[in-house]
């Protein structure tokens, strides 16, 4: 039976379809019947299903040809999701969803888009694909909320991870799909059929058409779908996807790849949008996230292995191809950002090989791939790069060998090889062929590539430093072969290899470097020289024995190479000379040999300064003697000169080079070699004196001087006549007026020769004590020597400065070695004349400095060689009197000369400097003593050191230092230590820096000289003098000069002594006052000590010794010294830095004493002295940088707090220093809070946060606050999850700071602004707070919260919401709650109730912005709360709304419910019965335009509309609840609420159009109860509601139902209200009563007219009566009200006119008369009302019906009417009045016609009407004209 019914129903549907003629009809039928018809497919009866199929076929034909017909998609989607539906039904349903969805308007598609997503869950893959195909085009048109909150999104995807994944995969395929791609299926079908039986189809899918790059066949097929998109549509789809991702609808992490692929799109719009989005997210994306990187690799490479993880073979149609080159070019730059990408093996190497050698690669991709190789080399960790190395190297070498087109690319490849070698040297060590290949490439490649090869080779050097045996020999040969290549870069790299690959004592490589040192190009020879001249062992403590080749071996090697080269074309020709090497290389060779010689002799090998080299001559001499005596010979190689001793070979090489090219260093080396062992070596040059003379004639002054010395050494080996002739020849050459150069050379040679002769003579005398044997030869020789000396003397007054200086030098050399062979006094050239002449030159401004220096030296030498020198004191006095200002160097020379002259023959100046060192020298036993040191000391101490002239004092100090240094063992010096100390102390307070430094050095020396008792006395005197500032007694007039301003030494506190006071206090603090001397020795910061003169004092050695003695005090010293290095006083800073550099040689010392240093600095940060505070800040700034501070984490809070205090210092420079220290401290702390630091990081955070939050952020100092916040933000970024335990303290503190740190002026402005301005301003303030760094930090913390932290955080948060001060704080709290609901919803559930009750306080905040924020938060919070909490909240809100009269409560209810509806729609649906009735009531709130009620109404309306299935459906659904709430509203004490309830009731009645019991009774009872009592504002709404309900439910009211008011009761109540005095209310009451009477057709006209008619009459009287005394405005208002009443009254009379003959009989005449009177007298508005009432009156007048005829009565009424209506017909002004009058006449004529009562219309009436109608013939409105003419014609016809 049921089946028959089903079929019948289907037949009827068929029939309806057949009858449907228009699209609209068809659409209506489909909308109504399609879903149920589809459900019939689940029928078990074949017949029914068949019928359905028939119907669907018919339907499909009709639908397809009519694209505009809409299908009931929404209903179909609901049906599709029904879990109970059978698959047959769902399969057909989706067909119509697919057909209907694209036809929908775009807005509707957007609305249904979320439903499509929901519908997908658990459905078969093809159907899911179809739904996504429908969804994707819609995304372009979707509107997303501005706030990117997950719960606010239209797609609530957070709970649908599977759907998200499906969607993302599909989107990826859409983005990969190229425009205009066509899937050629036909070909695939043919192929697949033929391939079915064959097993050879091995996964390649030969039967499957080629999918687009990056896609599988299946992916392409599903994107194309049933209705392929056009290119334009596809572009829109792609843009929609980008928009979707932009709106953060899916997790950012998941969508990164999509943006990367979209950014490679061929259409500009898509690529640009994706690029912009990628850029904006750049900082948020973690490129080291394996999930992101693996996805990129997968898309880039496609499915390379055909096996899935489980080992099953991947189906060919699912196999993805690699992406196109265009996409690859976008992916690789992102891989370059990622450390993870570099580590992911094997994908990294696959990408490299694909980019370099793939089939579709291009030069751009190759370049990027090479960059990726660089990236791997730099970032890949050691363990992970090992397996990659060989593959990378193979790839790179292959590229280098095969790819030659692009030089830039090749350059990158070579660079990559270099980087790889520095990471993995073991790969390269064995492969010398690769080096050769690169060297060859360097020779042949393009210039732009060479630089990269050069760089690569330079990096590779390190890989070959461990070569041995054959490999090393091979490398030697390789380097040698490339050192002679024409390309400069090749030679440069070869030098690098020679210097780095081999050890520094490797002879063949040194030889190669020596050859390179002769290279014409600076970059080659400069590098070679740098390596060769690098002094070994200077900075190393270990033995230097293996760091240079041994001298003999090196000499033999060079000799062998030289002799070989002489036989080959590589020899060098210069003039007539042939050299084995070019001059530059040869020069470097001999210098290097000299360095090897020095090294082998055990001294520091230097080649920079000849004077330094000469200091080592005695040691070298000893070594040479050893070599000569050991008889060491060369190996049996060919040796042209036959010399086999290395020294002889060395001298031979020097001779060869000197003869060919010359050069000062070569000359020196030869001179040195011969001078140190003249007896053996000089004799060989006796026969070469002419050659030596030629060297003496050189154009260079220094060369002549050295040659003259050389000549004197050679000559000194001869004697007798040979010597005589040589000296005579020299005298002759000197006197001959040759060129000045020849004279100069001869003059020097003469002096040196005579000097050596005298020295020899003196030595013989002391040795033999036997003068007799040589007596016979003496007179002759003495005469010759005297002649020579006089000859030299004659040149002293030469006009040539050159010759004068030479004469001076020569005389000095003679005087140093023996008594001058000239008279002491008298006329002519005497010793007195000579002394006076030389002394006169010192102050002379005509003389050069060189002349002055030589004159002083010479004077100092006279008493040295002559024990009986008569003018010793004269000479000394002269030297001491010749002080000149600012000639410091000269004073050091004078000091030296005074020292030599004072001690006379015992001076070290008398020694042979080539053979004896200063330390080794002892004066000859028989020398006469001429010591005048006591006298000199007395003159200096008692005359010069206390001179009023500061220059004299400075000079005296330098002389005194010289005396103490050089004569430290002299008894006179030792016995005057206190006086000398006193003298030095007096100079300490000089304003001149050098004077201070000299004095401090002197003090150190004095202390070292004393015995224990002396030292104690010296220390106490010094400390007393320094610390008390007691002046030195003999400095009488010094006071005025000592502290004169402007000199270097002046310190900020105006005391020259401040540096020394600090040193003294430093020593005293250590309880070791004597250490002050050590400090003074170390405080060596004047440049003077680095000069030749200064260095001679040997203070470096003293300083080293002092450093060693101070070592035990380092723990106490290091902290103080560290701080002193940053002292603002320059003098102190330099002195202390000097001491520091001397003491702290080990870099780790600071780390060792870190705690002590820190303790000292923190203590001194708050010192009373600003200088100390500033230096402590600066020192702290330096200390904290770049060192691990794990051990001092506990100290950090103290440092922060102290620096915060100093940041507010009174002195600006201290404040700046503190700011600098704080910035550094901040950076260091941020680094320490990195998760990589582990437990140390945790400890740091725990230590820092309380300090930064309580002290920093709450500081009154702006800078401190700013820095604290900045630091917190950075810490939160770097610390990550480590912040979790501290969140309960950190988050509330930061929330408080949002208000504390806001400028207070904003609060002031907010208070003064209007409501509208205030809201806008507060909104902007809250927005600024939310984007502030503090909020940024809070958001960072929130990521890591969970249940372990919430228990502590929530109570604090609640407290802050309730008692927090300030807009920012409260708004921030709300924002935090919102974030918590999304970050940890499950964990939050137990605490939601507490948070809700806290937020309730915010809901009633007077500030609308805070109120909105709290409502917004509450809207999110209900999602995580328990049902019981939510119910309590809703009850609370309900209570507020119904009971509280303040607008603030109503607003908060609207905002909260709206927020719940928007952000937690599911919660609202679950509690719809509580919420929606309230929303319905809220919708009907009576809006006050000035207030925000209009906005609230809109919010309520939105809640209602979004949660009910149409308003009618909603009312039906919640009728019970709606009535309950409206009843409650009506019973409210508030008039406004009563009125609101009434409006809501009226709305229910209107929209339902009929109410059934018992609801009708409930509503009416409630309304009638509300009517009782006095009139109140808004009571009118009750009346309107009653009228609405009665009108809508009149039929139901006819029935008698218990508890339902009867019609009679309703009328009684309403009529009662009509009698109320309030006219405005009365108008509504009368209108309501009329509506009720009309609806119920009740006859209550008597009562009604008794109320209304008197008022109409009264109104007429008043309006025609006398004006009242009220003011004009009130009058106007009253008139308007009366007019309104009149209109209403007439309208009501018309409506209330009953269908009762008796009543009509009683009132018809009166009513007609009343209307006619008003028609004649009133304004047009009243006339119009009266006419409308008249129309209703005649419409219901029973006299005009045949059965109730009364001709007489009717005639009377008609006459009355016709007389008055003519006024209206003839009203020319208002056409509306004419129109209404015509309708009345038309109605009358019609009624008379129907009742056949024409006779009642008398002729008088007709005439009146015809005349009036005639006036309308020219009417302006044609329709009226026409109607009037028609009626006139009708009337005329009656006659």
UniProtKB/Swiss-Prot annotation:
Belongs to the ECM29 family. Keywords: Cytoplasm, Cytoplasmic vesicle, Cytoskeleton, Endoplasmic reticulum, Endosome, Isopeptide bond, Nucleus, Phosphoprotein, Proteasome, Repeat, Ubl conjugation. It comes from the Eukaryota. GO terms for cellular component: centrosome; endocytic vesicle; endoplasmic reticulum; endoplasmic reticulum-Golgi intermediate compartment; multivesicular body; nucleus; proteasome complex. This is Proteasome adapter and scaffold protein ECM29. Residues 187-201 have a biased composition (Low complexity). HEAT repeats lie at residues 28-65, 107-144, 162-205, 326-362, 387-426, 429-466, 469-507, 683-720, 721-759, 783-820, 829-868, 870-907, 931-969, 975-1012, 1013-1050, 1112-1149, 1152-1189, 1194-1231, 1243-1281, 1285-1323, 1348-1386, 1390-1427, 1517-1554, 1558-1595, 1605-1642, 1646-1683, 1779-1822. Non-stoichiometric component of the proteasome; associates with the 26S proteasome. Interacts (via N-terminus) with VPS11, VPS26A, VPS36, RAB11FIP4 and RABEP1. Interacts (via C-terminus) with DCTN1, DCTN2, KIF5B, MYH7, MYH10, MYO10 and ARF6. The modification Phosphothreonine is found at residue 830. Residues 187-211 are annotated as: Disordered. It comes from Pongo abelii (Sumatran orangutan).
């Amino acid at each position: 039976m049921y089946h028959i019914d089903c079929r019948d129903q289907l037949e009827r549907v068929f029939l309806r379809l057949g009858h449907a003629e228009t699209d609209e009809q068809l659409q209506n039928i489909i909308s109504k019947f399609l879903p149920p018809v589809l459900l019939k497919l689940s029928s078990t009866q074949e017949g029914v299903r068949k019928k359905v199929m028939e119907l669907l076929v018919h339907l499909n034909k009709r639908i397809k040809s009519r694209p505009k017909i809409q299908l009931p998609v929404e209903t179909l989607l609901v049906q599709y999701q029904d879990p109970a539906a059978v698959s047959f039904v769902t399969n057909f349903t989706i067909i119509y969803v697919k057909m209907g969805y694209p036809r929908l308007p775009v807005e509707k598609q957007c609305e249904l888009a979320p439903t499509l997503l929901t519908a997908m869950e658990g459905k078969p893959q093809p159907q899911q694909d179809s739904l996504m195909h429908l969804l994707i085009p819609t995304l372009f048109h979707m509107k997303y909320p501005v706030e990117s909150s997950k719960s606010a999104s239209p797609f609530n995807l957070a709970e649908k991870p599977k759907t998200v994944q499906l969607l993302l995969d599909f989107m990826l395929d859409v983005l990969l799909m190229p425009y205009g791609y066509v899937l050629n299926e036909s070909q695939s079908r043919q192929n697949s059929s033929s391939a079915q039986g064959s097993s050879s189809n091995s996964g390649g899918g030969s039967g499957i058409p080629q999918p687009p790059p990056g896609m599988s066949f299946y992916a392409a097929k599903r994107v194309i779908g049933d209705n392929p998109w056009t290119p334009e549509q596809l572009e829109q789809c792609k843009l929609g996807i980008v928009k979707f991702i932009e709106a953060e609808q899916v997790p950012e992490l998941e969508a990164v790849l999509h943006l990367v692929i979209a950014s490679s799109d061929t259409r500009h719009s898509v690529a640009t949008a994706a690029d912009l989005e990628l850029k904006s997210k750049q900082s948020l994306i973690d490129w080291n996230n394996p999930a992101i990187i693996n996805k990129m690799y997968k898309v880039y490479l496609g499915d390379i292995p055909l096996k899935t993880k489980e080992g099953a073979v991947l189906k060919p149609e699912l196999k993805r191809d690699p992406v196109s080159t265009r996409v690859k070019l976008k992916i690789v730059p992102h891989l370059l950002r990622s450390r993870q990408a570099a580590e992911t093996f094997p994908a990294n190497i696959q990408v490299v090989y694909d980019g370099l050698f793939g089939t579709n690669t291009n030069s751009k991709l190759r370049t990027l791939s090479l960059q990726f190789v660089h990236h791997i080399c730099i970032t890949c960790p050691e363990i992970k790069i090992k397996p990659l190395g060989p593959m990378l190297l193979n790839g790179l070498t292959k590229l280098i060998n095969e790819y030659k087109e692009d030089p830039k690319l090749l350059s990158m490849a070579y660079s990559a090889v270099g980087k790889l070698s520095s990471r993995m040297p073991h790969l390269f060590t064995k492969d010398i062929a690769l080096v050769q290949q690169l060297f060859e490439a360097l020779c042949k490649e393009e210039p732009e590539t060479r630089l990269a090869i050069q760089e690569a080779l330079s990096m590779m050097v390190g890989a070959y430093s461990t070569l041995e045996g054959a490999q090393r020999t091979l490398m030697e040969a390789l380097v040698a072969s490339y050192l002679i290549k024409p390309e400069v870069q090749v030679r440069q790299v070869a030098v690098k290899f020679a210097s780095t690959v081999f050890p520094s004592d490797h002879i063949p490589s040194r030889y190669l470097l020596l050859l390179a040192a002769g290279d014409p190009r600076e970059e080659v020879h400069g590098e070679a020289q740098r390596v060769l001249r690098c002094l070994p062992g200077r900075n190393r403590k270990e033995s230097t024995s293996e760091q240079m080749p041994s001298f003999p071996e090196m000499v033999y090697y060079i000799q062998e190479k030289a002799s070989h080269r002489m036989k080959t074309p590589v020899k060098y020709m210069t003039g007539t000379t042939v050299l084995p090497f070019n001059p530059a290389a040869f020069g470097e060779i001999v210098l290097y040999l000299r360095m090897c010689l020095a090294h082998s002799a055990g001294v520091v090998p230097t080649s920079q300064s000849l004077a330094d080299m000469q200091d080592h001559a005695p040691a070298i001499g000893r070594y040479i003697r050893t070599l000569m005596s050991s008889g060491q010979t060369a190996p049996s190689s060919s040796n042209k000169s036959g010399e086999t001793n290395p020294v002889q070979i060395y001298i031979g090489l020097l001779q060869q080079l000197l003869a060919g090219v010359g050069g000062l260093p070569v000359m020196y080396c030869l001179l040195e070699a011969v001078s140190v062992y003249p007896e053996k070596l000089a004799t060989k040059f006796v026969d070469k004196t002419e050659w030596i003379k030629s060297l003496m004639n050189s154009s260079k002054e220094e060369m002549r001087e050295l040659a003259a010395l050389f000549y004197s050494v050679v000559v000194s080996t001869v004697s007798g006549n040979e010597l005589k002739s040589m000296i005579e020849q020299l005298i002759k050459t000197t006197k001959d007026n040759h060129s000045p150069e020849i004279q100069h050379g001869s003059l020097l040679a003469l002096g040196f020769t005579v000097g050596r002769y005298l020295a020899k003579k003196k030595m013989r005398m002391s040795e033999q004590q036997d003068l007799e044997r040589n007596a016979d030869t003496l007179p002759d020789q003495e005469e010759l020597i005297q002649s020579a000396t006089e000859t030299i003397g004659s040149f002293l007054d030469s006009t040539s400065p050159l010759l004068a200086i030479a004469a001076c030098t020569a005389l000095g050399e003679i005087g140093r070695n023996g008594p001058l062979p000239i008279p002491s006094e008298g006329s002519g050239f005497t010793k007195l004349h000579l002394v006076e002449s030389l002394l006169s030159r010192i102050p002379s401004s005509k003389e050069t400095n060189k002349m002055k220096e030589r004159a002083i030296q010479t004077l100092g030498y006279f008493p040295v060689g002559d024990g009986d020198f008569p003018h010793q004191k004269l000479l000394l006095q002269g030297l001491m009197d010749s002080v000149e200002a600012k000639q410091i160097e000269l004073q050091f020379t004078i000091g030296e000369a005074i020292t030599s002259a004072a001690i006379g023959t015992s001076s070290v100046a008398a020694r042979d400097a080539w053979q004896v060192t200063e330390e080794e020298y002892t004066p000859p036993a028989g020398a006469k003593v001429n010591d005048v040191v006591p006298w000199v000391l007395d003159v200096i101490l008692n005359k010069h050191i206390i001179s009023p002239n500061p220059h004299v004092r400075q000079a005296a100090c330098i002389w005194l230092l010289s005396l103490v240094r050089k004569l430290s063992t002299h008894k006179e010096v030792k016995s005057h230590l206190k006086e000398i100390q006193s003298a030095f102390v007096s100079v300490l307070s000089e304003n001149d820096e050098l004077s201070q430094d000299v004095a401090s050095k002197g003090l150190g020396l004095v202390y070292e000289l004393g015995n224990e008792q002396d030292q104690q006395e010296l220390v106490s005197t010094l400390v007393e003098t320094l610390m008390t500032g007691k002046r030195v007694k003999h400095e009488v007039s010094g006071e005025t000069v000592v502290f004169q301003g402007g000199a270097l030494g002046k310190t900020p506190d105006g005391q020259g002594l401040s540096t020394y006071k600090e040193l003294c206090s430093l020593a005293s603090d250590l309880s070791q006052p004597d250490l002050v001397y050590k400090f003074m020795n170390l405080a060596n910061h004047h440049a003077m000590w680095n000069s030749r003169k200064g260095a001679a004092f040997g203070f470096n050695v003293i300083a080293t010794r002092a450093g060693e003695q101070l070592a035990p005090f380092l723990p106490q010293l290091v902290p103080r010294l560290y701080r002193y290095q940053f002292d603002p006083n320059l003098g102190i800073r330099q002195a202390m830095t000097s001491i520091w550099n001397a003491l702290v040689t080990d870099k780790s010392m600071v780390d060792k004493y870190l705690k002590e240093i820190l303790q000292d600095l923190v203590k001194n940060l708050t010192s009373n002295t600003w200088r100390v505070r500033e230096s402590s800040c600066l020192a702290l700034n330096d200390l904290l940088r770049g060192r691990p501070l794990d051990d001092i984490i506990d100290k950090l809070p103290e440092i922060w707090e102290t620096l915060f205090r100093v940041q507010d210092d009174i002195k600006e420079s201290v404040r700046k220093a503190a700011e600098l220290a704080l910035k550094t401290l901040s950076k260091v702390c941020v680094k320490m809070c990195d998760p990589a630091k582990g437990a140390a990081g945790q400890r740091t955070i725990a230590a820092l946060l309380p300090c930064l939050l309580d002290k920093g952020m709450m500081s009154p100092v702006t800078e401190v606050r700013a820095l604290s916040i900045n630091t917190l933000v950075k810490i939160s970024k770097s610390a990550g999850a480590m912040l979790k335990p501290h969140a309960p303290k950190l988050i509330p503190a930061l929330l408080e700071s949002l208000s504390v740190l806001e400028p207070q002026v904003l609060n002031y402005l907010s208070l003064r602004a209007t409501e509208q301005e205030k809201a806008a301003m507060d909104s902007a303030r809250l927005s600024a707070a939310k984007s502030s760094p503090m909020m940024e930090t809070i958001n960072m913390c929130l990521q890591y919260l969970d249940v372990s932290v919430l228990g502590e955080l929530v109570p604090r948060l609640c407290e802050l919401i309730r008692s927090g001060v300030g807009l920012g704080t409260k708004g921030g709290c709300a924002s935090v709650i919102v974030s918590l609901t999304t970050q940890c919803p499950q964990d939050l559930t137990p605490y939601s109730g507490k948070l809700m009750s806290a937020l309730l306080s915010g809901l009633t905040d007077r500030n609308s912005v805070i109120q909105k924020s709290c409502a917004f938060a509450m809207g999110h919070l209900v999602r995580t709360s328990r049902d019981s909490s939510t119910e309590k909240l809703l009850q609370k809100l309900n209570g507020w709304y119904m009971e509280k009269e303040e607008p603030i409560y109503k607003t908060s209810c609207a905002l909260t419910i709206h927020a719940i509806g928007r952000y937690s729609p599911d919660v609202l649906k679950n509690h719809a019965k509580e919420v929606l009735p309230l929303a319905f009531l809220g919708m009907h709130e009576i809006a006050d335009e000035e207030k925000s009620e209009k906005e609230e109404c809109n919010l309520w309306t939105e809640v209602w509309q979004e949660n009910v299935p149409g308003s009618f459906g909603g009312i039906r659904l919640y009728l019970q609840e709606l009535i309950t709430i409206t009843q409650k509203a009506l019973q409210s004490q508030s008039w406004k609420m009563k009125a609101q309830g009434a409006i809501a009731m009226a709305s229910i009645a209107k929209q339902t159009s009929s109410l059934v019991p018992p609801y009708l009774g409930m509503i009416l009872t409630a309304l009638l109860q509300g009517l009782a009592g006095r009139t109140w504002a808004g009571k009118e709404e009750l009346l309107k509601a009653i009228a609405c309900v009665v009108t809508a439910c009149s039929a139901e009211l006819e029935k008698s139902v218990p508890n339902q008011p009867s019609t009679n009761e309703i009328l009684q109540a309403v009529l009662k209200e009509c009698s109320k005095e309030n006219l405005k209310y009365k108008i509504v009451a009368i209108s309501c009563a009329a509506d009720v009477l009309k609806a119920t057709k009740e006859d209550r006209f008597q009562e009604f007219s008794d109320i209304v008619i008197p008022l109409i009459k009264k109104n007429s009287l008043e309006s025609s009566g006398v004006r009242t005394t009220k003011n004009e405005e009130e009058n106007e208002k009253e008139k308007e009200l009366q007019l309104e009443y009149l209109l209403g009254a007439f309208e009501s009379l018309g409506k209330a006119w009953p269908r009762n003959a008796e009543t009509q009989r009683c009132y018809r005449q009166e009513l007609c008369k009343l209307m006619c009177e008003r028609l004649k007298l009133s304004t047009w508005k009243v006339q119009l009302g009266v006419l409308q009432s008249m129309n209703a009156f005649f419409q219901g007048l029973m006299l005009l019906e045949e059965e109730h005829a009364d001709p007489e009565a009717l005639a009377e009424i008609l006459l009355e009417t016709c007389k008055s209506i003519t006024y209206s017909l003839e009203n020319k002004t208002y056409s509306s009045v004419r129109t209404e009058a015509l309708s009345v006449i038309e109605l009358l004529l019609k009624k008379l016609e129907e009742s056949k009562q024409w006779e009642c219309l008398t002729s008088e009436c007709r005439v009146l009407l015809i005349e009036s109608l005639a006036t309308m013939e020219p009417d302006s409105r044609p329709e009226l004209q026409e109607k009037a003419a028609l009626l006139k014609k009708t009337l005329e016809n009656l006659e």
